[in-house]
């Protein structure tokens, strides 16, 4: 989890924002920024879903189901993020936004909000880790541990 927070903070995802009133963006900038924000909404939703599922998990089957669902959504996030990045990376619009004060402010606001959400999810990942340890003898738990590791590796590669 710590490496995920480090990834979010250090990746320099200068194209991510959440539109806020008061920070004027033209229609093209807003469209690009919204496109980059959409995959992160998927990831935040996946974290929230995992939190709710782990809280109500009563057995290893519930933990496996929760972890599998998180992996499905987190992998969807990676796929959608990569598609957006391929579409816009290196474009003139993205380059122009690097020098736009309003775009930078939107990016800062989004990154601050995202950082808070990711830091708040630390307890969820700690609870998941505890549940995975508690049911470690289950073959399905071992499978889902491997799947979680692969998924987290994909998430970390988003920055590349």
Predicted segments — roles?
Residues 14-22:
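C-terminal segment of classical bacterial N-terminal signal peptides
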Residues 36, 70-143, 147:
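Long, amphipathic, charge-rich alpha-helical segments that form helical bundles/coiled-coils
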Residues 22-75, 152-160:
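Immediate post-signal-peptide N-terminus of mature secreted/exported proteins
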Residues 1-9:
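Bacterial N-terminal signal peptides that target proteins for export
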Residues 4, 13-14, 31, 62, ...:
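Detector for intrinsically disordered, low-structure N-terminal pre-sequences
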